[in-house]
Amino acid sequence: MKRPRPHCSFCGLRPPETGRLLESPIEDVYICEDCVERAQEILAQEERRAPKGPSRLPRPQEIKAHLDQYVVGQEAAKRALSVAVYNHYKRLLHPEAEIGKANILLIGPTGTGKTLLAETLARFLDVPFAIADATTLTEAGYVGEDVENVLLRLLQNADFDVERAEMGIVYIDEIDKIARKSENPSLTRDVSGEGVQQALLKIIEGTVANVPPQGGRKHPHQEFIPVNTKNILFILGGAFEGLENIVKARVGKTTIGFTGERREREEPLEVIPEDLIKFGMIPEFVGRAPLIVQLHPLGEDDLVRILTEPKNALVKQYQELFRMEGIELRFTQAALKEVARRALKRGTGARGLRAILEKAMVDLMFEAPGSGVKEIVFDLPHLDHPLKALEEARLRQAS
């Protein structure tokens, strides 16, 4: 029996009415080149319509477990952030549900992990991320950066894929520095305070912002990239020095633990929106960051753990660099505790650890390659005399 001429199983056409036929492993099933092209176009359209958020939304427990690998302590903050970020992206996956956006305010002293938490979240979720410093921003008409430049950084990190940027995370640091100077609105414009809050308010609450692709100040004749900010998660961070006195006055306490030097493990007193308004944040701005997350000051033990425990801990980084030279590097507990003590004395928290350790290690990293030693033990005295660690290593190896 003569087989019928093959035809496209999708459009029904036969060559030469259509292009070349591609045969399926299933007998007598074909697709023509024209239908392949149409299928690719349909898939591309579907991909463009699909949300550009995380490819898979991890549960809060998974998010916190990832944060645990990089951020030491701050258990309550990590739990709260994990739930908040999960709910934010769950809301985007279900646009039919009318759930408002809940931006996040992180309160804690310098070096407690505010920026690290935001960075780690964005990296884990694989969404675009941008950091801005609120102190560099000014309202339109003043010297400084327009608030839209915050979104430009997000666009740049999304390779100018606008839809992907619109699902990103923005961390704005030093947000406490744009508090107005008094609780009562001033008759004059406060360039570094209320005006910037008002300008930021528009993009934080959700608007279509016109972003200058080259950055800098906007002018009438340049082209803009429209960016809808309604689904961008804004995480705001600040030390809010002096806020403890406002909370203390409200609750009638004489001590507070969320800023300054820690006394044992006391819990920070709860900050409420009214405290932030008294501090100098405008009510509308406070209302757009309803989740307030407080971070503990870090103690000596915390800083030692930060040096050694995270996946990318400083000690592990230095050990890997020396291992590449065939040298095993060990740090004594006494040396690590002294690094932590010096960082605490500087008042820079975890941020000061790298500077202290780098200063001590630079001479050692200069001399050790090619020295022939197999193991270096870095002890407390070597913080100020690092080359003694190399001399002692040579003596041990020779004996």
From Swiss-Prot:
Residues annotated as domain ClpX-type ZB: 1-51
GO MF, one example: ATP-dependent protein folding chaperone
GO BP terms, alphabetized: cell division; proteolysis involved in protein catabolic process
Record lineage: Bacteria, Thermotogati, Deinococcota, Deinococci, Thermales
InterPro entries, alphabetized: AAA+_ATPase, ATP-dep_Clp_protease_ClpX, ATPase_AAA_core, Clp_ATPase_C, Clp_protease_ATP-bd_su_ClpX, ClpX_bact, P-loop_NTPase, Znf_CppX_C4
Assembly information from the UniProt record: Component of the ClpX-ClpP complex. Forms a hexameric ring that, in the presence of ATP, binds to fourteen ClpP subunits assembled into a disk-like structure with a central cavity, resembling the structure of eukaryotic proteasomes.
Positions with a binding annotation for Zn(2+): 8, 11, 32, 35
Protein name, UniProt field: ATP-dependent Clp protease ATP-binding subunit ClpX
Positions of ATP binding: 109-116
Key words of the record: ATP-binding, Chaperone, Metal-binding, Nucleotide-binding, Zinc
Entry's Gene Ontology cellular component terms: HslUV protease complex
SUPFAM superfamilies per UniProt: Glucocorticoid receptor-like (DNA-binding domain) (SSF57716), P-loop containing nucleoside triphosphate hydrolases (SSF52540)
Task performed by this protein: ATP-dependent specificity component of the Clp protease. It directs the protease to specific substrates. Can perform chaperone functions in the absence of ClpP.
Sequence similarity: Belongs to the ClpX chaperone family.
